[in-house]
Regions:
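A short beta-sheet element
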Residues: 155-159, 163-222, 226, 231-234
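Hydrophobic alpha-helix feature that most strongly marks membrane-spanning transmembrane helices
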Residues: 11, 47, 130-133, 179, ...
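Short, well-ordered loop/turn elements at secondary-structure boundaries
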Residues: 37-38, 47, 147-150, 168-170, ...
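Non-catalytic DNA-recognition/assembly elements of restriction-modification systems
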Residues: 4-7, 16-19, 23-26, 32-33, ...
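DNA target-recognition patches
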Residues: 97-106, 126-191
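Extended, domain-scale alpha-helical bundle/helix-rich regions
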Residues: 31-32, 36-109
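Proline-centric
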Residues: 1-14, 18, 45-46, 114-123, ...
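Short, conserved phosphate-binding/catalytic loop or strand-edge motifs used
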Residues: 62, 236-237
Length: 237
C-alpha cells in the first residue's frame, strides 16, 4: 500500500512538472517575442494616427499634397524628374475612397487597410514621393574588389561593401527589393541612407519633396505586411 501511494504521488508530481514545463516554455516564447510584437504594435498605432494626439490646427494633408504636386511639376519642367505616366488622384465620396486613374474612377475601399484621421488622406507612393531607381548602378563582386574602400555600397538589407565613388549625397529612403528579409523581417526593409554612397539594383531609392518626412515613410513600410504583394519562392521579390 505504501509503495502504491509513493507511485501515485510521483505520478502526480510528474504531471505537475510536465504542465509547469509546458507553461514555462510558453512563457519563454512570449518573453522572446514580446519586444518585437510591442514594436510592431507601436508602429501600427503610429501609421494609423493613434500614437499621438491629433492637433486640429495642423495643416491638412490635402495642403501638403498640393505643395508636393507643385514641387514635382517644377522639377519636371527643370528636367530633374520624369512625369508620372499614370497620375493617381484618391478622394473620399459617400464615406468611401475612390481613385481616379487614367480618367477612370473606381472604389478602392478594399485597398485601404485601416481608418485614418479626418485631415489625413490616402495617396499612392508615386504621388507623394520621387523614385530614383534609374540612377542605381550594380557593381559585381569582381568589380568592387578592384576599388578602394571609401564609400558605403548598399544592397537590399543595408551596407554590403565599400567602393571608391558615390552616386548619392543626400539622405534618401532605401527599400529592399528582394530577398528573404521581405518576409522574415530580421532587419528593417526600409531604412535611411545618408552621407555619400552607392546603391545597387536590389534596393529601391526614394526621394521626398515639399517636406515629406522619409522617416515616417520608412515607419509605414516597416509596419506594413508585404506578404500579399511578394512574388517568388526561392527569391522573394
Amino acid at each position: 500500500a505504501e509503495q502504491e501511494r509513493i507511485v501515485a504521488c510521483i505520478q502526480e508530481a510528474e504531471l505537475v512538472i510536465e504542465n509547469y514545463a509546458i507553461k514555462a516554455t510558453a512563457l519563454q516564447k512570449l518573453q522572446d517575442s514580446f519586444p518585437e510584437a510591442l514594436k510592431k504594435s507601436i508602429l501600427q498605432e503610429a501609421v494609423q494616427g493613434k500614437l499621438v494626439p491629433q492637433d486640429p490646427s495642423d495643416e491638412p494633408a490635402e495642403a501638403l499634397l498640393e505643395r508636393i504636386r507643385a514641387e514635382k511639376q517644377r522639377l519636371i519642367k527643370e528636367g530633374k524628374i520624369k512625369k508620372d505616366k499614370h497620375e493617381s488622384v484618391i478622394f473620399r465620396r459617400d464615406n468611401s475612397h475612390y481613385e481616379k486613374l487614367d480618367g477612370v474612377e473606381r472604389c478602392i475601399d478594399d485597398e485601404t487597410p485601416f481608418e485614418i484621421p479626418e485631415n489625413w488622406c490616402w495617396v499612392r507612393f508615386g504621388t507623394a514621393l520621387v523614385n530614383r531607381d534609374a540612377e542605381r548602378i550594380p557593381l559585381s563582386v569582381s568589380q568592387r574588389e578592384k576599388l578602394d574602400k571609401k564609400y558605403d555600397y548598399y544592397g537590399a538589407s543595408g551596407v554590403i561593401d565599400k567602393v571608391d565613388r558615390y552616386l548619392f549625397d543626400k539622405p534618401l529612403l532605401l527599400v529592399g527589393e528582394d530577398g528573404a528579409n521581405l518576409l522574415l523581417r530580421s532587419k528593417p526593409i526600409a531604412f535611411i541612407a545618408s552621407g555619400q554612397y552607392w546603391v545597387n539594383n536590389h534596393a529601391h531609392v526614394i526621394d521626398a519633396v515639399a517636406g515629406v518626412d522619409l522617416r515616417y515613410i520608412a515607419l509605414f513600410i516597416n509596419a506594413t505586411n508585404l506578404a500579399p504583394y511578394v512574388t517568388g519562392t526561392a527569391q522573394p521579390k
